[in-house]
Amino acid sequence: MTNLGSGLTRRRLLAAGGAAAVAGLAAPALANTDPIRVGVLQPLTGGLDALGVQGLNGATLALLDANDSGGVNGRMFEIVQADTATDPKTCVERANDLIRRENVSAIIGPVTSANRDAMRPTIERAKMPLLYATDYEGGVCSRYITCYSALPDHWVTPMVAYANEMIGNSFYLVGSDYVWPRKMNAAFVAQVSQLGGTVAGEEYTPWGAKDFTATLRKISDSEVKTVVVSIAGADAVTFVKQFAAAGMNKEIRMIFFGFSENYLAGLSPDESEGILAPTNFTSSLTSEDAENLKGLTAKRFGTDAIVSNTVDAHWTLTRMYIEGIRRAGSDDKEAVTDAMVDQSIRSGNGEVYLRASDRHTDLNVLIAQAQGGKMEVLKDLGRISAANQCG
């Protein structure tokens, strides 16, 4: 176990990313109540490390800042960190550890839909609040799963309309071989069909793919205007590098679902130039809300810390959970589950709203483009309310 105090740094977070680690946060000397233990279950190894660290940073930022302000209801937070290893079986094992051995009051994570779906029965049996802050394909309706997640209504529908107007209506779809890319692409195909466009090809790549030559050849031969990417993690960086090395980025536009500052860190400006992505936050924003999040992140993790959509989502949802505890007057799981919904809060990109009807969030949506190694906003779509996921 590793103690992570208020002087937490990004380097120390990364170093703590193996087995479950308890972040012991010292309570004031006069405190006489037990700390509230919160599990942060993220992929800190296994190919989605960058996303996992960003999720951990966002949750940690909210919890440590709450402690610095005296905690909630006179109680401090204690972080219990665990690694899914980007593997559904491991994710379930770690979830069981957090629930049975670590006695956490809530779990923040994981990242992939495959991991979330694998652990869902465990969560619902234990009646354990799960705070899920990753974009996904939609359809989760559970009392115990609260989502700060961009759904196809947030990202796919406006992105297809934008591409149809600004680029063209022919597409080739490439994704990792799991549920999120497949269902996102199904939504994409449906939207393209409604607008009279064409999807020339659709394929899915295994985890750990190293050579995309055959896929790139098919894309080139299809003569489409746009390639749509939903490859996850390190594989996505490999794909973009090979796409650029083949000179295809000069002729074919790329829409990349989930693209953010996380990926920019692994690409040169030339390799990332022109990539389009829907997002809910980007660090190029200069609003008061964005500057607040960037300032808090720099103060906590250092000025070189990445501030991405993933950080914002986990930071905001964790603060919603903290407010739920304040409203409930305790960390009782059922009471907090009831108390944290029907809540508006300031994110890094304006006010968002957590619905009681399906425990999903109305989000502010941007269309951004990689320019000169940064994500620049092309269009601010404002707040979008997705369809009820329990309807």
Regions from the PLM with identified roles:
Residues 2-5, 9-15, 31-391:
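Extracytosolic ligand-binding ectodomains
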Residues 17-21:
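Sec-dependent signal peptide hydrophobic core
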Residues 26-28:
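N-terminal signal peptide c-region/cleavage motif recognized by signal peptidases
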